[in-house]
A protein has these predicted regions:
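An extracytoplasmic/periplasmic, membrane-proximal ligand-sensing/linker region
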Residues: 36, 49-82, 229, 238-250, ...
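Extracytoplasmic/secreted proteins, especially bacterial periplasmic and envelope-associated proteins
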Residues: 72-79, 83, 102, 106, ...
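Bacterial N-terminal signal peptides that target proteins for export
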Residues: 1-10
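Acidic, polar ligand-binding/catalytic clefts
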Residues: 105-163, 174-177
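Bilobed "Venus flytrap"/periplasmic-binding protein-like clamshell domains
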Residues: 57, 62-87, 144-215, 223-227, ...
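Ser/Thr-rich, Proline-interspersed low-complexity disordered segments
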Residues: 15, 22-55
């Protein structure tokens, strides 16, 4: 081979080697390990602030037990609501739960925003159950106590509590102090056991059930008759009924607003069915009444704000002095509270003693 061709051949080999080197990938170092990012916790949503108690968005619940006609309670309750709202600037909501037990349970379930007009038995149970606290008690015609009464047909031969043995008993609700608990204790003390028991739904309904012949006797609240002229209560524990010589004169007033017998106005549960049964006094008599019972209460939920409670208490005292009170809770067809006065928890120890003696509990009134 000539030198010229040898040079060309070597040059081609060098160029080929360079080309091959260019095609070979360069060595690379292993990638460094990377740490996975820490998971991030999303920020918690900001809680919506609770509306103030007593605001339109969070009204104060005013609870009434369904012891009389619910329509009357709602109508009168709305009058009270309007008066309280005007006096305090707070917002209220009237409610009539379906039973005494439901009223107690609502106060315990809503401890910060409920106030309830509940009887002594309901208060005794609610205070033990969750700390419901009494503020006021009813005054009726000058009395801070009231009574249970046992009604029987006027033409019956029933002469004493012992004669009720085995007879059909009508009562409003097992949560009622005067309608059920106190009569139950009276029967136990007398050593008698009534027969069939009929829960009628309220005092009015019990008086009506007796009038209709659906039960043999009924137990309801008792308030003494009042003098037509003076308005004063006429009370004799040994003779609580309208005197026999006045019974035939008992009649509705021209406006159907009352039953009057001579100069006495009937104030017990019979008067509440006067329009449906205007001759109820001629058909039903009072067999006997109970010992004194502490009057019904206005109580507050256990965590009700003290400042709001004080405003409401002041407003209620002022409301009780107005004519509108008589159209509200002071109406004969409502709870017949003619006034209010301060109450203490200890006043209801008498009821607690009865509860303990009978083994009664909230379960018994559900």
């Amino acid at each position: 081979m000539s030198k010229r061709y040898a040079f060309v051949a070597v040059s081609l080999l060098v160029l080929a080697a360079i080309a091959l080197g260019a095609c070979t990938p360069a060595a690379t170092s292993a990638p460094e390990a990377t740490q996975a990012p820490e998971p991030t916790t999303p920020p918690e949503p900001t809680a919506e602030p609770m509306p103030d108690i007593g605001s339109p968005e969070h009204p104060i619940k005013v609870l009434f037990v369904p012891s009389v006609d619910v329509a009357q309670i709602v109508t009168g309750g709305e009058i009270m609501k309007a008066a309280l709202e005007e006096a305090t600037g707070l917002t209220f909501e009237v409610s009539v739960p379906t039973s005494y037990a439901a009223t107690i349970e609502e106060m315990c379930a809503s401890p910060t925003d409920t106030m309830g007009f509940i009887p002594g038995l309901g208060y005794a149970l609610a205070s033990e159950l969750c700390g419901v606290d009494v503020s006021f008690k009813a005054n009726r015609f000058g009395y801070s106590v009231y009574w249970a009464q046992i009604l029987v047909p006027r033409d019956s031969e029933i002469a004493s509590i012992e004669d009720l043995e085995g007879l059909k008993w009508g009562y409003g609700d097992v949560g009622s102090t005067s309608g059920y608990m106190v009569p139950l204790v009276m029967f136990q003390e007398a050593g008698i056991t009534p027969g069939e028991q009929i829960q009628t739904g309220g005092h009015n309904q019990s008086a009506q059930a007796l009038y209709n012949g659906e039960v043999d006797f009924a137990t309801t609240f008792y308030s003494p008759a009042t003098d037509v002229d003076s308005g004063a209560a006429v009370y004799d524990a040994s003779a609580p009924d309208i005197p026999e010589d006045l019974v035939s004169s008992c009649a509705l007033t021209s406006d159907a607003g009352a039953i009057v017998c001579g100069n006495l106005r009937v104030r017990d549960a019979r008067a509440n069915i006067r329009e449906a049964a205007p001759d109820v006094v001629q058909k039903e008599r009072i067999l006997m009444i109970s010992p004194d019972i502490p009057n019904d209460t206005l109580s507050f939920g256990p965590e009700f704000p003290a400042d709001l409670r004080a405003q409401i208490e002041e407003a209620l005292v002022a409301f009780a002095e107005t004519d509108a009170w008589a159209e509200s809770i002071g109406s004969q067809d409502f709870y017949n509270w003619t006034g209010i006065e301060p109450a203490t928890d200890a006043e209801y120890d008498f009821i607690r003693q009865m509860v303990a003696a009978t083994g009664f509990s909230i379960e018994d009134i559900r």
